[in-house]
Amino acid sequence: MVNSKTVVSALALSALAAAAPAPSSTTSFSINQVAVKKPAIHPAVKYAKALAKYHAEIPSNVASAAASAQSGSATNKPTADDEEYVTPITAGSSTLHLDFDTGSADLWTYSASTRGVGSHSTYDTSTGKKVSGASWQISYGDGSSASGVVYKDKVVVGGVTASSQAVEVATQVSSEFSQDTSNDGLLGLAFSSINTVSPTPQKTFYDNVKSSLAKPVFAVTLKHQAPGTYDFGFIDKSKYKGSLAYTNVDNSQGFWQFTADGYSIGGSGGGSSFSAIADTGTTLVLLDDSIVDEYYSQVQGAQNDSSQGGYVFDCSADLPDFGVQIGDYTAVIPGKYINYASTGSTCFGGIQSNSGIGFSILGDVFLKSQYVVFDGDNLQLGFAAQA
């Protein structure tokens, strides 16, 4: 049976192929996200997943709220968001919907033989060449894990081909992954130094195609409640206002990590600097406790609710904007974006604690307000407000 996701991706890929430039030594392209239906997921589940990704200690109240939601025993059921946005690619002959993740460096997906594959679309391994002796494994503090083998195959994203891309194929996955039907795996866009393939780490798609791009950059335009785009090889001035504010990247841990020069709440500045990671693979914004507490002190009725796993408030509450200072530029998250999701009787905040991991995570709640340029050659990030 052909599902709607397959039809959408086939149409999207054919349209992209028609619009894409012919491959050359220097090229550029855009690829659009597509919408897929997703089940209702309590925001505490996503919060726990984000902490686990960075091996942070998951507070007991967050773990409890997430477990209750996943077991179906939660008192308050979340309202289902209609859609989630993923990006279509081809690996060999297979069309896959992947989550493009600037917080990891593995391209991994499912095959028909994956234990726990569920309803995911799968990669046809017959088109690839298995890498002898290579394996990979990821495991997180929330108990989720995946592991498998590695193939080399042609991977096409938009108008550019990586002719020998490592495709990490899961042989087994935990229930946390198999039950998440919103994507068919990840395409990591962090630095190749944190790729998990053993004994020899593999290059990311970006590193493999970077030399063929007109400019060695990619840019991200995520959207609030709408599909976004990823631009490779060029900067699209029509997608942002004013000038890009650049800041240096510290990639020593393999992430797109930088120092924010301060923060503001409701337009009032003065907050101290903090280290942060730009991460398209994390939904929420995770900050130091002191900043989180300061923010919600400005929201009438907000409370850190242990039963919900984080800060909640009345859904009609007026939330202040949150600003991240980058040089002379303030990247502003509109307050309405921070009203992340309903838990039934209250709404869950898009800003939550980073559980003391030593840096902040600026996930989609932040990125959906910005046009962000990722420049791996010059080790810098550029930010501007979306047009």
Curated annotation (Swiss-Prot):
It comes from Talaromyces stipitatus (strain ATCC 10500 / CBS 375.48 / QM 6759 / NRRL 1006). It is found in: Secreted. Residues 1-19 form the signal peptide. PANTHER family: ASPERGILLOPEPSIN-1-RELATED, BETA-SITE APP-CLEAVING ENZYME, ISOFORM A-RELATED. Belongs to the peptidase A1 family. One of its GO terms (biological process) is proteolysis. CDD domains: Aspergillopepsin_like. Its EC number is 3.4.23.20. Residues 85-384 form the Peptidase A1 domain. This is Penicillopepsin-1. The active site is at D101, D279. Disulfide bonds join C315-C347. One of its GO terms (cellular component) is extracellular region. Secreted aspartic endopeptidase that allows assimilation of proteinaceous substrates. The scissile peptide bond is attacked by a nucleophilic water molecule activated by two aspartic residues in the active site. Shows a broad primary substrate specificity. Favors hydrophobic residues at the P1 and P1' positions, but can also activate trypsinogen and hydrolyze the B chain of insulin between positions 'Gly-20' and 'Glu-21'. Glycans are attached at N304. One of its GO terms (molecular function) is aspartic-type endopeptidase activity. SUPFAM superfamilies: Acid proteases. It catalyses: Hydrolysis of proteins with broad specificity similar to that of pepsin A, preferring hydrophobic residues at P1 and P1', but also cleaving 20-Gly-|-Glu-21 in the B chain of insulin. Clots milk, and activates trypsinogen. The keyword Zinc does not apply. Gene3D superfamilies: Acid Proteases. Residues 20-66 form a propeptide.
